[in-house]
């Protein structure tokens, strides 16, 4: 049975509430207790009013085909920011977002009315947009360590290099980002024009590259991937395993609160929730991918996906910086920082995205493999077999392409791998990313031998593989062949074009 009271938090500052506010409203934060309480009340009241409409949704078991997927034991080695933010969850939306009053009211209206109709994932209020002609100014909290600052600088540089937005350090500029060591990992969404500066909390445990780029993407103007109105077509949200008082964190975004970018859903977006977020039983998923093979892609914090880069470039119309658009292969886009070259998905390099990256892993035997009508076999390897040190934050890569003649597709399977010994959810040590041709989206991540001898078919006439190595050496064997295409000749696998 579902009880309405779980969504209402009394406005009395007890010890947990006081602790949460102390973490958020540190000395430098221009926000206030009054404002945070007001915004919390707006969301709480909306869910209190909506309760009769959601009865019956709780406790529904996920379809057996989704629940039975085997991705190995859960990875409990690193804490996710959904866990790091437990102490402040009552004042955040979707775990790491600080809403302003206008955003809270829009979301509250959607909560009460069930108003979802579009594929939206970025801000629509132009007052929350940053200018492409003026830098986004930022300042580092003096409480951040040199290591914290160095890590966050890499994330800032990433968005500077991969969009038409520019960033500049200035401790006195108006409307600057204040990169803080406040408790937890969080940010406001978009530019907060009513604040002299806005905080982005990226202190210890929140300064990894993936998490820092995630929080900066909020500040740039993006919501979470699973907030999209069309998310139920791609993921199953198991409300029966979600802490009732945290169910509001799975709210789909209001149609008038987010920008329509016509982007496909990407399981590997850096803005996608961790699949155990807010679980009652932390050994069971709260979010399950409906597409086979993509469960391990969700919640990745290695780096932004190429679709995230495309999203930021679309939101700020970065293509307008170039008078002539490049003809890019393999889902690449014109680089707004250099209009004479393409910006490529990670599986490709070169001025027009048609070359194989050299890879960063030692002993990488990356290659372009030509498929014929007969099954061919290839033994792949990358990494140092004598290395037994590991880092889950830094990985090396090796790439392989499989190509068939134009007008044909590729059948592909993995036939041999020692992955059983390292099979674990999220694949923290070694993994293989398989992209069947939607190169502007993140691929399937696997590190378990359950994938062996499953036959996959490419979208068109190319498959890209990426070996991800954080420990020792990755080895695996594959088989592949070319087959007649079942798709029209005009098919374009690039979903963003």
Curated annotation (Swiss-Prot):
Tell me the InterPro entries matching this sequence.
Answer: Astacin-like_dom, CUB_dom, MetalloPept_cat_dom_sf, Metallopeptidase_nem, Peptidase_M12A, Peptidase_Metallo, Sperma_CUB_dom_sf
GO CC field: extracellular region
Q: Which residues form the propeptide?
A: 15-120
Residue stretches making up the Peptidase M12A domain: 121-319
- Which cysteines link up through disulfide bonds? 164-318, 185-206, 328-339, 331-342, 344-353, 364-398, 427-447
What is its subcellular localisation? Secreted
Q: What region holds the EGF-like domain?
A: 324-354
User: Is Transmembrane tagged as a keyword?
Assistant: no
Instruction: Work out whether the entry's keyword set contains Cell cycle.
Output: no
Q: What does this protein do?
A: Metalloprotease.
Stated name of the protein: Zinc metalloproteinase nas-28
Organism listed in the record: Caenorhabditis elegans
UniProt lists the gene as nas-28
């Amino acid at each position: 049975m579902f009880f309405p009271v779980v969504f209402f938090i009394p406005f009395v500052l007890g010890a947990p509430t006081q602790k949460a506010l102390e973490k958020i409203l540190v000395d430098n934060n221009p926000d206030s207790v009054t404002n945070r309480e007001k915004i919390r009340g707006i969301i709480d009241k909306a869910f209190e009013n909506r309760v009769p409409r959601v009865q019956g949704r709780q406790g529904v078991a996920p379809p057996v085909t989704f629940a039975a997927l085997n991705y190995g034991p859960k990875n409990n080695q690193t804490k996710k920011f959904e866990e790091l933010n437990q102490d402040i969850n009552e004042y955040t939306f979707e775990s790491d977002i600080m809403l302003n009053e206008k955003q809270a009211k829009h979301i509250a209206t959607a909560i009460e009315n069930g108003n979802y109709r579009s594929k939206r994932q970025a801000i629509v209020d132009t007052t929350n947009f940053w200018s492409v002609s003026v830098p986004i100014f930022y300042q580092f909290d003096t409480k951040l360590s040199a290591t914290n600052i160095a890590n966050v600088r890499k994330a800032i540089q990433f968005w500077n290099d991969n969009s038409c937005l520019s960033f500049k350090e200035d401790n006195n500029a108006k409307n600057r980002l204040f990169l803080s060591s406040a408790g937890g990992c969080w940010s406001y969404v978009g530019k907060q024009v009513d604040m002299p500066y806005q905080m982005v909390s990226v202190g210890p445990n929140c300064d990894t590259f993936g998490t820092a780029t995630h929080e900066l993407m909020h500040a740039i103007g993006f919501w979470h991937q699973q907030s999209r109105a069309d998310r139920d077509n791609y993921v199953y949200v198991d409300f029966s395993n979600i802490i009732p008082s945290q169910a509001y964190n799975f709210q789909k975004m209001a149609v008038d609160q987010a920008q329509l970018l016509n982007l496909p859903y990407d399981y590997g977006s850096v803005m996608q929730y961790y699949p155990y977020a807010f679980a009652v039983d932390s050994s069971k998923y709260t979010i399950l991918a409906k597409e086979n093979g993509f469960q391990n892609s969700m919640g990745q914090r290695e780096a932004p996906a190429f679709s995230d880069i495309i999203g930021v470039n679309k939101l700020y119309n970065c293509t307008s910086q170039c008078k002539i658009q490049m003809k890019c292969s393999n889902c690449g886009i014109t680089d707004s920082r250099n209009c004479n070259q393409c910006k490529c998905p990670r599986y490709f390099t070169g001025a027009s995205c048609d070359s194989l990256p050299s890879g960063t892993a030692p002993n990488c035997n990356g290659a372009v493999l030509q498929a014929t009508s007969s099954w061919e076999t290839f033994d792949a390897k990358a990494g140092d077999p004598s290395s037994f040190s590991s880092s889950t934050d830094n990985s090396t890569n090796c790439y392989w392409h499989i190509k068939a003649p134009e007008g044909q597709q590729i059948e592909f399977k993995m036939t041999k791998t020692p992955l059983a010994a390292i099979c674990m959810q999220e694949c923290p040590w070694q993994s293989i990313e398989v992209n069947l041709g939607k190169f502007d989206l993140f691929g399937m991540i696997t590190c378990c031998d359950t994938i062996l001898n499953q036959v996959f078919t490419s979208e068109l006439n190319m498959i890209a593989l990426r070996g991800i190595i954080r420990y020792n050496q990755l080895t695996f064997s594959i088989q592949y062949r070319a087959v007649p295409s079942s798709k029209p000749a005009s098919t374009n696998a690039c979903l963003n074009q």
